Every structure is written in C-alpha cells, then in structure tokens.
Amino acid sequence: EAKFQAWADSDPARKAKYGAALPGLKKSYEDMSKYALSRTYMNEAINRGAEIFMMAFQTQSLGTALASKETKPEELSALVEKAKGRSAGFYEEFNMATDRTLFAELLKLYHKNVPKEQHAPIFQEIETKYKGDFEKFASEVYNTSIFASKEKYDAFMSSPNSKKLEKDLGYRTMKSITDFYAANSRNAINAITNDQNKHNRAYMAGLREMNPDKKYAPDANGTMRLSYGHVRDYYPMDGVYY
C-alpha cells in the first residue's frame, strides 16, 4: 500500500486518478465500523432470528394496503389471499415455545451489544413498561400477537383491519426495529458502501496500471472461482458415480 501510494503521488495525473483511493478506503472502513454491530444484529437477530418476525415482515404490504384509502378491493383481496396462503406451511413446523425463547434472547443481545443511539423506540418501551425484562416482553408478544399461532393468524385474515394490525405487539416490534434501521442505518451503510466501491475500483485500476505485467484474479465472490489441480471421477457411494 505504501508503494502504491508513493507511485500514485509521484505523478500529478496519477495522483488525480488514484491518490485518494487508499485514504478513501481507510475512511470508508472506519465509517462502516460504526454500523457493524447494528447491521450484523439486524441480519442475524431480526431477519434470520425468531420466525414471528418473518411472518410480521411479510405482512407489511398488506398492512400498507389496509391503511391506504387508495387500495382497490381486488388488490386488497389478492394480498389477503397471498397472506392466507402462507399460514399452513409456516405454522406446520412453528414451535411457539422455542420461538419465544429465541425472540427474547436475541432482542436482549441486540439491546446489550448495539450502541444505544442505534436502538429502535421499542427498546425504550421494553425498558420502561417491562423494566428491561425481555422474557416478560416476549411472553406478552406471544400471548397476544396474531402471528403467534395459526388460529390467531387465520382469524385475523378472515377479517383483517388496519387498527388491529398496527396495535399488534409482534407487528409493532418488527416495524419499530426495521423502520428505525432503514431511516438511521441502512441509508448510511449504502452510502458508505458506494463510496467504498468507488475507491476500490480506483485502487484496482491503479494496481493494474502500476503492474501491467501482473495477472490479477477476479473477485471470487462475484465470478467463477479459480481452481488448481485436476478434476477426477468421484464415487461417493456404491453405485453412484460422478
């Protein structure tokens, strides 16, 4: 990196093209570190955490339609039927006790490890109304939410209404976290990522210009991976051959 920077800075034209690449990358990684925990916990604790979040999240389009006076009856009907179609497959393997425990523990970790200024408003409600007791909060969610059982979910979908959905504690928790993240973290992360990509492209272009005879492998995450050696026949078990 020092060699590259010296090479870029030694020529005015190169400095204009490549001089800011490494300092820009350094700054973008420093900026991204501020959001590393919130992004990780959003992905792992919310998006891939308790299954009740997934069902609530998938109901957002219906919630928007229910709240809008512009929604046509046929559009609303189609969304309701789509939501109903998720019921059987989801609740067939849904274990409420396990999901409730997962819900409480992951929210507790989110609250503990993500910086407080990146907490959604629902965490303030848990701190005040539930005295920071995530198990108590989880019990309230799973005892009352329409997403906690097939019976409650199907009953709601038989006569859906916006007010009931907006008051649902499971739905409110999901909306509070995802909306706050979108407004306060996701846009910043996207902007930093774009900046990071811009500087990385400049850095790679500069490296290729600095070392014209060197071969660079493409990014293995976006292209076919390089492989070495020989591909041979494979017999995983008796009677099976690849």
Language-model regions, residue ranges each:
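Terminal presequence/propeptide segments associated with secretion/organelle targeting
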Residues: 1-242
